[in-house]
Amino acid sequence: MTLNPPSPSNASGSVAEDASVLTCAIGDVHGQIGKLELLLDHCERRCAGYATRLLFIGDYVDRGPDSRAVVELLRDLQRSRPGEVVCLRGNHEAVVLAAASDQLHTLPGDVDMELWLGPSGGGLQTLASYGIAHASQLPAEDLEWMASLLLSYDDGLRYFAHAGVHPERSLAEQVEDDLLWIREPFLSHESTFGRLVVHGHTPLKARVPDLRANRLNIDTGAGYGGPIAAAIFDDRQRNPLAFLTNAGEIRMETASHG
């Protein structure tokens, strides 16, 4: 992997001459507040001079050391920059909400309290960051914020959703379970979705973004010790201009092009 400090002279792609807004789409965070703060600094430098939308793909909590700080940072960002910060809900926010209301049995799959609090779920780290023993003790403000998060975002060129979309449904007909949880048949689908689908949810072993003809995965494994990744887009071209992580900019040719 080739990493460089993000700067205009090291741009991986060129912003269209008539572009007016850049979008910085940020992958799964999983309680990694230090990495997130570094990445946001890189995004600010890379997008300097343009109106910028920050779009977070979900999974802010669990596994990492400070879910509470991540939630507070994102909530404060939305308040201080109204209309400029979009936060989507991830399946881990859905799990936290369900755990807080004793509704884990309503979720897809075999999610239960033991799984969520275990090593794969990472819920124990979330509770520890709040200094509490049970999800029902989470601050109402944080639970209300998680419940308010969008499930998807369509900017006309790209469709953003935490996990992806179901290929057998139009983008307008997607349902919550798929937007938050899907892997197959989404990941193996090769035909167009009508937009470039930008998603996370499935950690990439290579720890670099994976750009396909019809989708882009930006979950580079922050929940398992990897970096947090971001993709920079303008409002005139579908594909990303650059990829960043908390460690710096990734040259486009280094990213996976499956």
Predicted regions and their residues:
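A short acidic-Thr-Gly-centered motif at the start of a beta-strand
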Residues: 10-19, 45-47, 78-80, 151-154, ...
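N-terminal active-site segment of His-dependent metallophosphoesterases
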Residues: 1-73
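Acidic, His/Gly-rich catalytic cores of divalent-metal-dependent hydrolytic chemistry
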Residues: 18, 179, 184-258
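Residue-level marker for buried hydrophobic side chains located in beta-strands
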Residues: 25, 54-56, 87-88, 159, ...
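His/acidic metal-ligating clusters that form di-metal
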Residues: 136-207
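Divalent metal-coordination and catalytic microenvironments
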Residues: 28, 59, 74, 90-91, ...
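Active-site neighborhood of divalent metal-dependent phosphoester bond hydrolases
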Residues: 50, 63-150, 182-188
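Active-site environment of divalent metal-dependent phosphoester hydrolases
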Residues: 30-34, 62-65, 92-97, 167-168, ...
